From Swiss-Prot:
Binding sites annotated in the UniProt record for ATP: 14-21, 40, 132
Site feature (Interaction with tRNA) residues: 133, 344
Annotated source species: Rickettsia akari (strain Hartford)
Active site positions: 108, 204
Gene: mnmA
Protein role: Catalyzes the 2-thiolation of uridine at the wobble position (U34) of tRNA, leading to the formation of s(2)U34.
SUPFAM superfamilies: Adenine nucleotide alpha hydrolases-like
NCBIfam families: PRK00143.1, trmU
Keywords: ATP-binding, Cytoplasm, Disulfide bond, Nucleotide-binding, RNA-binding, Transferase, tRNA processing, tRNA-binding
Region (Interaction with tRNA) residue spans: 154-156
Gene Ontology biological-process annotations: tRNA wobble position uridine thiolation
GO molecular function: ATP binding; tRNA binding; tRNA-uridine 2-sulfurtransferase activity
Catalytic reaction annotation: S-sulfanyl-L-cysteinyl-[protein] + uridine(34) in tRNA + AH2 + ATP = 2-thiouridine(34) in tRNA + L-cysteinyl-[protein] + A + AMP + diphosphate + H(+)
Protein name per its UniProtKB record: tRNA-specific 2-thiouridylase MnmA
């Protein structure tokens, strides 16, 4: 079992009400730490009425409170709704309106879950903030490093690439060395009712998976129709609003043609969705912005061969990277990759170690 330092130290645990963070709280409590549970109320629960398996909903806050009561630890629910809307939901909506495919879970980790919650944990006198993420914090020759979770099926390193080295020093991830089954067995050993609670799915603030309704509620004129144009220049029909399309999409285009067509580009300025054959989706290189680099000892101004992930569900692909200014990098695949979508994350790995990452821009070739 992972031991997080001296007994009787104060550790804040970010408790979502799920099995992972509950197991972390129980583990640390058993080790003798002074555990404080904090659950964040992130959005209007009414928006998620009827949605099952969504994190941070009303049931999850109740479950976190019940776990804390069973363990006999203090538990606080913090209203972060306005911060969450400003940092995550508004960014999510604006990203779709810009023809991008956003990744709100990364924005949430980067802002309210780490930046703001670390500040709160420090104010409470905690020596660490522990979470239920499946990643590992490893001590390297040049300081702390972020590594993939030991269980590749549950690894969440892709979603934590924006974590800074300063934040990483303060954070702890006890489940990085566990499989999901081991976590559930641990929770069961502690007698936690959430031991076999289903994992959260999809985006927590999107009712029934219908993100379009969220966008249209916040931006009522979001679904403005426009042209669908073939990449060869001729019009094929009209679309129902660029928020309804993403790079690589094939279904639901509503157009007839003599070969399968895919969304290959979205132009928000002129409100155009461009389509083309599958071959048009292949990308050799692209630019990422707002790069967070965690490997200070590696001279990132040189060309490096690494592995990169452009979607959480895709395996890493070999690529060469080179620095462009202070916060941009060029990524060049060793062999072309399909459907690189602006707004998604590109995370850079050297084996199991996360070197850094950034956001995919429109500069795609």
């Amino acid at each position: 079992m992972i031991n997080l330092g001296d007994k009787h130290s104060t550790i804040v645990v970010a408790m979502s009400g799920g099995v992972d963070s509950s197991a972390v709280a129980a583990m640390l409590h058993e080790q003798g730490h002074n555990v404080i549970g904090i659950t964040l109320q992130l959005y209007d629960h009414g928006m998620a009425v009827g949605k099952k398996n969504a994190c941070c909903a009303g049931q999850d806050i109740y479950d976190a409170k019940m776990v804390a009561n069973k363990l006999g630890i203090p538990h606080y629910v913090l209203d972060y709704e306005s911060k969450f809307k400003e940092s995550v939901i508004d960014n999510f909506v604006d990203s779709y309106l810009q023809g991008e495919t956003p990744l709100p879970c990364v924005q949430c980790n980067n802002s309210v879950k780490f930046r703001d919650l670390i500040k709160t944990a420090r104010e409470l006198g905690a020596s660490q903030l522990a979470t239920g993420h499946y990643v590992r914090k490893v001590s390297g020759d040049n300081g702390v490093e972020l590594h993939t979770g030991l269980d590749p099926a549950k690894d969440q390193s892709y979603f934590l690439f924006t974590t800074t080295k300063e934040q990483l020093e303060y954070l702890s991830f006890p489940l990085g060395w566990f499989t999901k089954d081991e976590t559930r067995k641990l929770a069961s050993k502690f007698g936690l009712e959430v031991a076999y609670k289903p994992d959260s799915q999809d985006i927590c603030f999107v009712p029934d998976g219908n993100y379009k309704s969220v966008i249209n509620t916040i931006r009522p004129n979001a679904s403005e129709s426009g042209k669908i144009i073939h990449i060869n220049g001729f019009a094929l029909g009209e679309h129902s609003g660029i928020i309804n399309y993403t790079i690589g999409q094939r279904r639901g285009l509503g157009i007839a043609y003599n070969e399968p067509l895919y969304v290959v580009k979205i132009d928000p300025k002129d409100n155009i969705v461009y389509v083309g054959p599958e071959a048009a989706l292949h990308v050799q290189e692209f630019i990422i912005k707002d790069v967070n680099w965690l490997a200070d000892e590696i001279k990132d101004n040189k060309k490096l061969e690494v592995a990169v992930k452009i979607r959480s569900t895709r395996p890493p692909r070999l690529a060469a990277i080179s620095k462009l200014g202070d916060d941009k990098m060029k990524i060049r695949f060793l062999s072309a990759e399909k459907a690189v979508a602006p707004g998604q994350a590109c995370v850079i790995y050297a084996g199991e170690r996360v070197l850094g990452g950034g956001w995919i821009t429109r500069d795609i070739r």
